[in-house]
Amino acid sequence: MSVTKEQVIEFISNMTVLELSQFIKELEEKFGVSAAAPAVGMMMAAPTAASAEAEAEEKTEFDVILKEAGANKIAVIKVVRALTGLGLKEAKDKVDGAPSTLKEGVSKEDAEEAKKQLTEAGATVEVK
């Protein structure tokens, strides 16, 4: 009985990270190859605008930065409290100390939602 490619893929997809790491090491030893990318090619390639755009697209963690509170500071403080779970004094200190980072390492959806809420309250916000 021969094993199909689909069965191999299914088997590998059910492996844990540790098992997969050991599996890769065994394959490297058996075939005398390395799964690591060659460093020479990376050093020769100069960064271009296209690669910078691709890197920006691949980014998965974003920071929400309050640039300034705007005219309606009270509404912005309320939104900051709701987004961060901070107390009134801490939220006010964040708003008064702008520019300040409100959220770090959040998903793009969460960052955009926070930006939307803060902008609606009158704040100037940046997502990095």
Curated annotation (Swiss-Prot):
Biased composition (Basic and acidic residues): 105-118
Sorted UniProt keywords: Ribonucleoprotein, Ribosomal protein
Region feature (Disordered): 97-128
Entry keyword annotation includes Cell inner membrane: no
A single GO molecular function term of this UniProt record: structural constituent of ribosome
Ranges annotated as spanning the membrane: none
GO biological process per UniProt: translation
One Pfam entry name: Ribosomal_L12_N
SUPFAM superfamilies recorded: ClpS-like, Ribosomal protein L7/12, oligomerisation (N-terminal) domain
Gene Ontology CC entries for this record: cytosolic large ribosomal subunit
Function, in words: Forms part of the ribosomal stalk which helps the ribosome interact with GTP-bound translation factors. Is thus essential for accurate translation.
Quaternary context: Homodimer. Part of the ribosomal stalk of the 50S ribosomal subunit. Forms a multimeric L10(L12)X complex, where L10 forms an elongated spine to which 2 to 4 L12 dimers bind in a sequential fashion. Binds GTP-bound translation factors.
Family: Belongs to the bacterial ribosomal protein bL12 family.
NCBIfam families: L12
Protein name: Large ribosomal subunit protein bL12
Species, as recorded: Lawsonia intracellularis (strain PHE/MN1-00)
Gene it is expressed from: rplL
